[in-house]
Amino acid sequence: MELKVIDAKGQVSGSLSVSDALFAREYNEALVHQLVNAYLANARSGNRAQKTRAEVKHSTKKPWRQKGTGRARSGMTSSPLWRKGGRAFPNKPDENFTQKVNRKMYRAGMATILSQLTRDERLFAIEALTAETPKTKVFAEQVKNLGLEQVLFVTKQLDENVYLASRNLPNVLVLEAQQVDPYSLLRYKKVIITKDAVAQLEEQWV
């Protein structure tokens, strides 16, 4: 499998031989869906909470007498039927949203994502990703010269200048190869991977 390599102007300047197992795998939509759902679920903090009818602030006084008013009977204002009443089945902070994905499935899922991105010409390789200064304006111009709007850069080791220059750009994300996740790969329109990061991804997932 050959992966297109682009230069500093975003033009295809060559190709890089890559593993078919990682970049030429058949697309598995169900597996990708499971991976993304698991990633988003595991990112949840799980701190949402509502109060039960015993926890809301209320009076224990009966709103009106049991019979004779013509209205529905009511015991207290903390009932879930009442405005500002407690929830019948409230969410609690100890709720666990963790979803487990086996290592074999995760590797297969990442491979199918990378393969589909390559087929859709959304994934390219680049010689290296560097920045002379930690200036956002300079790095933004560099990204613009590549002809990119919304892009994920993947490097083997994150350069400090690149990190500082890119962190305030809303449509640019820079990750190390070991940090790459399925959601980020699919979220951005283009994915640019440095050559040494490609080698590391092959070592991790093949």
Curated annotation (Swiss-Prot):
Source species, domain of life: Bacteria
GO molecular function terms listed in the Swiss-Prot or TrEMBL record: rRNA binding; structural constituent of ribosome
NCBIfam families the record matches: rplD_bact (TIGR03953)
Similarity comment text for this entry: Belongs to the universal ribosomal protein uL4 family.
Renumbered residue ranges of the record's region Disordered: 46-95
Protein name (Swiss-Prot/TrEMBL): Large ribosomal subunit protein uL4
Subunit and interaction comment: Part of the 50S ribosomal subunit.
Biological process per Gene Ontology, one example term: translation
Any one cellular-component term (Gene Ontology): ribosome
Claim: rRNA-binding is one of the keywords in the record: yes
Function of the protein: One of the primary rRNA binding proteins, this protein initially binds near the 5'-end of the 23S rRNA. It is important during the early stages of 50S assembly. It makes multiple contacts with different domains of the 23S rRNA in the assembled 50S subunit and ribosome. Forms part of the polypeptide exit tunnel.
Pfam families referenced in this protein's UniProt entry, alphabetically: Ribosomal_L4
Biased composition (Basic residues): 59-70
Keyword rRNA-binding in annotation: yes
Record keywords: Ribonucleoprotein, Ribosomal protein, RNA-binding, rRNA-binding
